[in-house]
From Swiss-Prot:
Transmembrane segments: none annotated. It is found in: Plastid, Chloroplast. NCBIfam families: PRK04208.1 (NF003252). One of its GO terms (biological process) is reductive pentose-phosphate cycle. Its main location: plastid. This is Ribulose bisphosphate carboxylase large chain. It is an enzyme of class 4 (lyase). Its cofactor is Mg(2+). One of its GO terms (molecular function) is monooxygenase activity. RuBisCO catalyzes two reactions: the carboxylation of D-ribulose 1,5-bisphosphate, the primary event in carbon dioxide fixation, as well as the oxidative fragmentation of the pentose substrate in the photorespiration process. Both reactions occur simultaneously and in competition at the same active site. Heterohexadecamer of 8 large chains and 8 small chains; disulfide-linked. The disulfide link is formed within the large subunit homodimers.
Amino acid sequence: GVGFKAGVKDYRLTYYTPEYKTKDTDILAAFRMTPQPGVPAEEAGAAVAAESSTGTWTTVWTDGLTSLDRYKGRCYDIEPVAGEENQYIAYVAYPLDLFEEGSVTNMLTSIVGDVFGFKALRALXXEDLRIPPAYSKTFLGPPHGIQVERDKLNKYGRPLLGCTIKPKLGLSAKNYGRAVYECLRGGLDFTKDDENVNSQPFMRWRDRFLFVAEALFKSQAETGEIKGHYLNATAGTCEEMMKRAVFARELGVPIVMHDYLTGGFTANTSLAFYCRDNGLLLHIHRAMHAVIDRQKDHGMHFRVLAKALRMSGGDHIHAGTVVGKLEGEREVTLGFVDLLRDDYIEKDRSRGIYFTQDWVSMPGVFPVASGGIHVWHMPALTEIFGDDSVLQFGGGTLGHPWGNAPGAVANRVALEACVQARNEGRDLAREGNEIIREASK
């Protein structure tokens, strides 16, 4: 007989290994699978493990030149999803050697690059990844992290306040700087470029950077507080992005910004390295995330994108608001907020956390609550997010009937009132509106 047998093979034989004991160095993934009708869950789970690691659809003679057992992904557990008739969570373990060190890009290409178009599946969603210390230690992570940022800004014991400058498109650089100044002068810690403000005909990046820097230093001198504006360095090429970051450093501003999903992880990691080497903080916006994470049964959950960002590097990242959404959503949001800022996060399925994650002292990222929030949400936000967060009010500041500065004052006063009330032991959930009403006098 021939030693090599060609043909299409059953994935289950090689890639479904329920007896496998996961290694401390394995990268683990939890996938929410919806197989096509008639495809058994084990076959689907094995197919996911195969297609995202060493497998191909047929036996090839070159398989004999390597040790599949050493390099293959393994589906080691499958559980049905409660309340869904044909949906399963498949757990896959990947050997560490499948991944390039320090490359989020390669990690994602391997795990989610190919398998999502797989015919035997109707839908697939990466719910969570367990990043082992052996891999996370090959990343430098956030340029500075929560603690260092507080020290640089000299702001402690409260959330930080931000505001996106609106109208996001159409202001001249001079007027844009003016709006920045008003907000910072009124009491905000940060203002922000909108994610789609890059370098358009009505306002070129260099002009904006210059006038914003002027606004920063003026408001800083007048308030005696350190101020920042997230200067968006996102650009069409990595070289252009770096040029903008370098100019920001030359101006002496404290922080720049990047759209990490549209800009890409490779660009983001380069920028994070530059920021670390040059003392710039890095604010990350998640434009495009909903394209990837909005559908429950297909795509990638935001907690995976959040973990990837913490590895790639960023000091702040947008993380939703929680206010006014469903209870369950609140728990899940708090789950990935903790994954961003804590050192050690226990597995907790009620919060959507499928694996215990140990970051081994990789710096944490400030979660940014932003989008449709205003001063009356302040008690809830303070309670939900705690001190280590950035609360961002766009229209909630600039929409103030008296203008930007009074809007900023209102937000700062409300925040200080909520923090004080909490520290005095009052119940923010119950007395929130009363606290704001008193403060507004």
